[in-house]
Amino acid sequence: MSDLLPLPPAAIRLPDLVRQHPPLVHCLTNQVVSQFTANVLLAAGAAPAMVIAREEAGDFARMASAVLVNVGTLTPVQADAMRVAVAAALEAGTPWTLDPVAVGALAFRTQFCRELLSQRPTAIRGNPAEILALAGEASRGRGVDSLDDSTVALAAARRLADATGAVVAVTGATDFITDGERVIALAGGHPLLQQVTGTGCSLSALVAAMTAMTDDPLSGAAVACALMKLAGERAADKAAGPGSFAVHLLDEIAALTPADLAQRWPA
């Protein structure tokens, strides 16, 4: 895979832009991770809003800087609110990110997420099994967990990006972020990231926040992945286990600088 690209220098500046000009991120996310997602966005300098009522979703999506759709605890009522928010985001030109949690494992959410693909998501962030399933390919998933390696899903991610116009981030031991042509690869992270509920979902929220700050969604999605990986590595050095890791992860997200990212992933 000689065509893999490093983290772009322009992307490294985006976390500082988020802190200087906090984007308002409208999160239609699942009830398990809502608080942690909000805290991750706050740590990164963004402004989270967890507006989920169908009656408010459209109005809020129009005023937001970015919209996140996460189907982790999807219900028919929530799906209706998501449809309204996505339609309003498209009308307003607001970037929106799809997190297809457990797609492929359950029929209702799989059908719903495939429906949303026609609404031109700016970015899609998922694990290998989710990306494979969303692309219509066989995957080995167990609920929200993936038994596939991210390398296996890269070709599917590229095809999904080509078909939808979205940037696709397939995350694992190595994260691959692609717009169908360009591919950025980021190795790293720490196993403790899989021991705390909500790290993947909050990463998708970071993708939404970062893509709101740039005309190049590939750079936005890539720096979000880099931020979570490096914060995870640093938090693990200080943590005694999953509980303290979650706290340190927030601290490290808040503390990371462009220089830290450039040192970890030199161009």
From Swiss-Prot:
GO function terms (MF aspect): ATP binding; hydroxyethylthiazole kinase activity; magnesium ion binding
Return the EC number: 2.7.1.50
A Pfam family annotated for this chain is: HK
Q: Which residues bind ATP?
A: 125, 171
One biological process GO term for this chain? thiamine biosynthetic process
Enzyme class, broadest EC rank? transferase
Origin superkingdom:
Bacteria
Q: Kindly list the cofactors needed.
A: Mg(2+)
Q: Where does substrate bind?
A: 50, 198
| Matches recorded under SUPFAM superfamilies | Ribokinase-like
Q: Which InterPro entries match?
A: Hyethyz_kinase (IPR000417), Ribokinase-like (IPR029056)
Q: Which reaction does it catalyse?
A: 5-(2-hydroxyethyl)-4-methylthiazole + ATP = 4-methyl-5-(2-phosphooxyethyl)-thiazole + ADP + H(+)
Assigned keywords, A-Z: ATP-binding, Kinase, Magnesium, Metal-binding, Nucleotide-binding, Thiamine biosynthesis, Transferase
**Pathway, per record:** Cofactor biosynthesis; thiamine diphosphate biosynthesis; 4-methyl-5-(2-phosphoethyl)-thiazole from 5-(2-hydroxyethyl)-4-methylthiazole: step 1/1
What family is this protein classified in? Answer: Belongs to the Thz kinase family.
Quote the function comment for this protein.
Catalyzes the phosphorylation of the hydroxyl group of 4-methyl-5-beta-hydroxyethylthiazole (THZ).
Name of the molecule in the record: Hydroxyethylthiazole kinase
Origin species, per record, is Laribacter hongkongensis (strain HLHK9)
Q: Taxonomic classification, please?
A: Bacteria, Pseudomonadati, Pseudomonadota, Betaproteobacteria, Neisseriales
